[in-house]
Amino acid sequence: MAFTDRLLDAWYKGHPALALLRPLEGLYRRVVEGKRARFLAGEGTIYRAPVPVIVVGNITIGGTGKTPLILWMIEHCRRRGLRVGVVSRGYGAKPPSLPWRVKADQSASEAGDEPLLIVKRSGVPLMIDPDRSRAVQALLAAEPLDLILSDDGLQHYRLARDLELVLIDAARGLGNRRCLPAGPLREPVERLGSVDALLYNGATADRDDGYAFMLKPSALINLRSGERQPVDYFPAGQALHAVAGIGNPQRFFNTLEGLHWRPVAHAFADHAVYSAQALTFTPALPLVMTEKDAVKCRAFAADDWWYLAVDAVPSDAFVDWFDEQLLRLSP
């Protein structure tokens, strides 16, 4: 098990050695709390866009299903006649310049895996830049938009926001509820009291403090041919290699097991860079990966490589609440 995997395991399952990291946690908390205090006091340069900005983020390290929910929000807003744009940090991307407009024909190394996935799926105008304020300004200069979604950026306080949504993995929760490096939190748990809504990925019902949403498998898609098959394409009991380079790979493997397949799990680091050699496994079996991984593997994919497309399905109560917010934010 890699060091990062051991650390994640300790954060969520507990380990006495984490007590040694608490002095560093104290330093980290002072930095992030000071940063937020300066924002609340109006210090520094804060950019407020001429259109509403909705931040979709988390306070934990690891995946929470953010990208599928953003895709749902894009389509939901479009159905209500809103022109939507997205900004993202573009983690791992190496574009020729910044800010950078992501196009569907770009590579994941140029655009970043998650931004490229969003553009390929939705065709939405999307700009990447670690400076999200600059990304928003560039996007608005290029496109007439009614609304901006910020993919993550909860801690990017230089960008003013009109709505903050925080996603939490319902199964893992907040781990030991401690900040980095003694726990998985980017900000103290008290920060959740100031956001507009919590969404629990994998919850089967709304909770007192937040809404439920599920990730529903929608199709198997062949990396090479683009062939689309229903999720029952493989028979029950089918053995296959399962590849996941996401924040919480086990959630993907559990999904495959829920489809009654027998996955041979191959977990990689989040935003991993792949090669054909790295994904050549024995015995020879069909390979199924996440859609986020697929955008990095099409160029060297074998004939029997597939990705599982998933769609976010939020609760009815969240849909109603979100519609109310859109009406409130509309001019």
Curated annotation (Swiss-Prot):
InterPro entries referenced in this protein's UniProt entry, alphabetically: LpxK, P-loop_NTPase
UniProt keyword list: ATP-binding, Kinase, Lipid A biosynthesis, Lipid biosynthesis, Lipid metabolism, Nucleotide-binding, Transferase
GO BP of this protein: lipid A biosynthetic process; lipopolysaccharide core region biosynthetic process
UniProt: ATP binding residues: T60, I61, G62, G63, T64, G65, K66, T67
Record-listed E.C. numbers: 2.7.1.130
GO cellular component, one term: plasma membrane
Keyword Mitochondrion carried by entry: no
Pathways involved: Glycolipid biosynthesis; lipid IV(A) biosynthesis; lipid IV(A) from (3R)-3-hydroxytetradecanoyl-[acyl-carrier-protein] and UDP-N-acetyl-alpha-D-glucosamine: step 6/6
Enzyme class: transferase
Family under the similarity heading: Belongs to the LpxK family.
NCBIfam families per the UniProt record, alphabetical: lpxK (TIGR00682)
HAMAP family associated with the record: LpxK
PANTHER family with a match to the protein in the record: TETRAACYLDISACCHARIDE 4'-KINASE (PTHR42724), TETRAACYLDISACCHARIDE 4'-KINASE, MITOCHONDRIAL-RELATED (PTHR42724:SF1)
The protein's name: Tetraacyldisaccharide 4'-kinase
